Swiss-Prot record:
Lineage of the organism: Bacteria, Pseudomonadati, Pseudomonadota, Alphaproteobacteria, Rhodospirillales
Family, similarity comment: Belongs to the MoaC family.
Reaction catalyzed: (8S)-3',8-cyclo-7,8-dihydroguanosine 5'-triphosphate = cyclic pyranopterin phosphate + diphosphate
Pathway: Cofactor biosynthesis; molybdopterin biosynthesis
EC identifiers of the protein: 4.6.1.17
GO biological process, one term: Mo-molybdopterin cofactor biosynthetic process
Keywords, in A-Z order: Lyase, Molybdenum cofactor biosynthesis
Keyword match Lyase: yes
Source species: Azospirillum brasilense
Name this protein carries in UniProt: Cyclic pyranopterin monophosphate synthase
């Protein structure tokens, strides 16, 4: 078995098996990331949300919390993603 990755693919070994890249030699660096998404809905649904008329509560606050939780759990959701210390997460 060889540890040399397939040409151009750092997350696969020479046999094509998925591997987690060794980042122990990397220096800590400041990083920033931006994600964007869209939610499609009926105009009536949007009006209810904006008026606070949804019976189950504040939809936008729950969505904001879900975005923050998603950022915190990224290594659990994306295969082979290294956990990084987060200092801030903002959801607009």
């Amino acid at each position: 078995m060889t540890d040399q990755p397939l040409a151009g693919f750092t997350h696969f070994d020479a046999e094509g098996r998925a591997v987690m890249v060794d980042v122990s030699g990397k220096a800590d660096t400041e990083r920033s990331a931006t994600a964007r998404g869209s939610v499609l809905m009926q105009p009536e649904t949007l009006a209810l949300i904006l008026q606070g008329g949804v019976k189950k509560g504040d939809v936008l606050s729950v969505a904001r919390l879900a975005g923050i939780m998603g950022a915190k759990r990224t290594p659990d959701l994306i295969p082979l993603c290294h956990p990084l210390m987060l200092t801030s997460v903002k959801v607009d």
